[in-house]
Amino acid sequence: MTLIKSISGIRGTIGGPAGDTLNPLDIVKFTSAYATFIRRSGASKSNTIVVGRDARISGEMVKNVVCGTLMGMGYDVLNIGLATTPTTELAVTISGAAGGIIITASHNPRQWNALKLLNEKGEFLTKDNGNEVLGIAEKEDFEYADVDHLGKYTEDDTFNKRHIDAVLALKLVDVEAIKNAHFKVCVDSINSVGGIILPELLDALGVEYKFLNGEANGDFAHNPEPLEKNLGGIMDELKKGGYDMGIVVDPDVDRLAFICEDGKMFGEEYTLVSVADYVLSKTPGNTVSNLSSTRALRDVTEKHGGVYTAAAVGEVNVTTKMKDVHAVIGGEGNGGVIYPESHYGRDALVGIALFLSSLAHKGCKVSELRASFPNYFIAKNRIDLTPSTDVDAILVKVKELYGQEKDVQVTDIDGVKLDFPDKWVHLRKSNTEPIIRVYSEASTMEEADALGKKLMQVVYDMQ
């Protein structure tokens, strides 16, 4: 079964039996449930819902089903076409729409697609709202419009430009300094919408560029998750010389990774760290990232006199905590930069513009910038369990076991995280599989992996 239902929407592979995969029947059901939720919430007087999509091969089909269903529910559709996730989020607020649906499976392979659901603020639904949509879908508790009240359909392809204009207007984006730096970059946009919008952004910033996998045809040239193991092509291109850096995005352009001028990874965890360091140097304040993100953000925040706070994993949890503590910047260690001066959503365009501004001001190489930050390494492991295992009970036992130790800070807002003076380990249960994900960080990869393996053995001994 490859249809996964969650509070943020539904995702699955295309094709196969109804109910088991992402198919037209389930797309109609969940789109109808979402439209019903928006109507009942009464949060917006608008009768328009924005639809945007990445360049996946199945995107056109899914878009047609989504738009037709929304019109059948009586909603007007504003289709912004091929667009990034942050562009679609901004389109909701710019147009004053009641909500939005992003058609993208983010970093998942080409056979996947998904519906991501937005509220009237262009932000992902809260847990309670998401559960309400799931409940409506389960009961099929929706009613379609009669012939006199069907929705209208409009297309508007101007939102890429509006997004870029909004990025260029940010006070900390120094367009002049970037132009004067005469940067040359190599970009891997993984055959999706980054290949459409990033050339326009880089042109506006006066950056010379070469694109790899720049055709937005959805036929991904490699696994689209922006991890080192998938990026051999662009790393080899950087090693040839002649570039200041490499830029990598995922298919919907909400994740961002950099590559140093020598072809070595900057480190996806350090995308947010580097951008935050620049933002905090200009506008001191607080920061937020999720529990599984590098401690380097905390170090950089405290260096600038701010307070770092950890949130549960998930963008909506991070943005909620950012609002609570009035964070000036935040995000997730997977390369997600959230800058409230722009909007409360991960945005690679904002990340690129702020990073280039920082680099232009510092006048150093990207590798030198990376060397200026605290060095941490994250190991990722998993514990496979039987379906009958009580994962929650195991996590409670881990919490109780380490809760008595003096030098360990225990956090249980999302699984169990154990913070030691010089390292940490985070255990999270999966919502879709009988596994516990184990993330651990230390000053060397060997130490991080050893800590993770130690906790894995603790869990095995508890069964």
Name each region found by the language model.
Residues 71, 131-165, 260-333, 337-338:
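Proline/glycine-rich low-complexity loops and linkers
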Residues 97-112, 238-260, 265, 308-310, ...:
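Glycine-rich phosphate-binding loop
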Residues 1-68, 72-73, 152-185:
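An N-terminal, well-structured beta->alpha segment
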Residues 13, 113-238:
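Gly/Ser/Thr-enriched, mixed-charge loops and adjacent short helices
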Residues 52-53, 187-189, 260, 341, ...:
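Short glycine-centered, acidic/aromatic-flanked micro-motifs in structured strand/loop junctions
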Residues 36, 48-112, 200-259:
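N-terminal small/polar loop signature for handling phosphorylated ligands or for N-terminal nucleophile
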